[in-house]
């Protein structure tokens, strides 16, 4: 949408300066193979569908009432699945909202917060929105996070693990180094993709009072369309997030989303089976692309980050699109020769590989 300078006179000065986040494309064209936004290729648990239908058909009358502002049933389900106390759980309308509350609750400090120069691009957006001071820490030449860079004075630390878009994960020992180096600052580990092979820092919660772990149901639980995210931390940090949330939106999660997410957490067998299917497919996709001459960074996510020495990444993305396949291309320094490719089903991945082999490379 184009807005004229004259029309912008109604805007707050701060809003005129904002550079908003640009989400991955959600194409309106049918029959495209969508490998650009890291959505799960498999549906949610059948129990999720049953739970949503139950709300619609068996409890329809309650839709006139506000949902539980605390989403108690959901917090209890998460706490049980993670083996923690319910007081250590915070929930929100997707992990993006949870992250926004984290920035407001913890990151308005005199010193800058630290995060990688190549990471989730919502972090600089939140920083600008809230007026957070920041310092971007360059990844090393192998696109890895060097935790020694996060021992300098700061106002907090936020790290995506596995990192996005690079897909590389830190070990728990490395995360502990960051926590121990910053005992008086909040360290946030954003684990949107952790269920695809990385180690979760949730196991460290009771040992570190400065740790917040953020997760989502969008990726590994196939609920991107319902927007449910959560944070896990000691109760004194959760209290800060609740204070922010109740100063912004007391009812962030609707009844359908609560019911669906609860059902997802209660079906651990299905969850683990689908995660393993993605992991197995990812490893085969990496092998197949390597044969075609791609260099693929080591992935612990449901996507891969790949480059080809003989082909321009931007042109590859365009040629794939012409063949009905969408991948994510970032025209940014250091990564403008990489493609981020969501792991699909084996059939979808095979179509990608065959298209590259027969029609593009």
Curated annotation (Swiss-Prot):
Its cofactor is pyridoxal 5'-phosphate. It catalyses: L-histidinol phosphate + 2-oxoglutarate = 3-(imidazol-4-yl)-2-oxopropyl phosphate + L-glutamate. Its EC number is 2.6.1.9. GO terms for molecular function: histidinol-phosphate transaminase activity; pyridoxal phosphate binding. GO terms for biological process: L-histidine biosynthetic process. Pathway: Amino-acid biosynthesis; L-histidine biosynthesis; L-histidine from 5-phospho-alpha-D-ribose 1-diphosphate: step 7/9. It comes from the Bacteria. The modification N6-(pyridoxal phosphate)lysine is found at residue 219. Pfam families: Aminotran_1_2 (PF00155). SUPFAM superfamilies: PLP-dependent transferases. It is an enzyme of class 2 (transferase). Keywords: Amino-acid biosynthesis, Aminotransferase, Histidine biosynthesis, Pyridoxal phosphate, Transferase. InterPro entries: Aminotransferase_I/II_large, HisP_aminotrans, HistidinolP_aminotransfase, PyrdxlP-dep_Trfase, PyrdxlP-dep_Trfase_major, PyrdxlP-dep_Trfase_small. NCBIfam families: hisC. Belongs to the class-II pyridoxal-phosphate-dependent aminotransferase family. Histidinol-phosphate aminotransferase subfamily. Homodimer. This is Histidinol-phosphate aminotransferase. It comes from Acinetobacter baumannii (strain ATCC 17978 / DSM 105126 / CIP 53.77 / LMG 1025 / NCDC KC755 / 5377). The gene is hisC.
